[in-house]
Amino acid sequence: MERERNLNNLRYSSSKFLQQAIRVNHAGEYGAICIYSGQKFILKKSSIIKEIIEMEEQEKKHFHYFNEKIKEQKVRPTVLLPVWRVLGVSLGVATAIMGRKTAMACTAAVEEVIGEHYKEQVLHLEDGELRETISKFRDEELEHRDIAIEHNAEGAFGYNILSSFIKTGCKAAIYLSKLI
């Protein structure tokens, strides 16, 4: 009886983790698209617009993947998507208004947190298609971070403070999207 209860608890725990992972990844990719959308609006004539568009296109592919997983696994999306839209576009616009370096500092901070978040998920997921895909997406997110650093993200005024602020916001969004 005890063993059966433990097995049921493990199944519930695994199922709950899977649902939270899909929900939060769906929300995160949506938020990233919104950030890039805000940056594109301001930096449309900038020398880094090509990179921003390419990174946004990858985020759209990630989002579509998790959107399919939401449907396939019957996972409830976070109710916070409208909030993430407003905050994401606003963050993209605000950092882009402060200049290319600040926009790239935003990208570097966000992608670093997402890379760590995906790494943690990969460690907890069983082998399979979802784990492989999240691992691939993690590599792509870290490429975005590296592109941002190559474009002098760390040269942004107040980089350390800005980066810490954005990383904290991302971690809060991850936490809330898992639950709500």
Model-identified regions with their sequence ranges:
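Non-heme di-metal
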Residues: 1-180
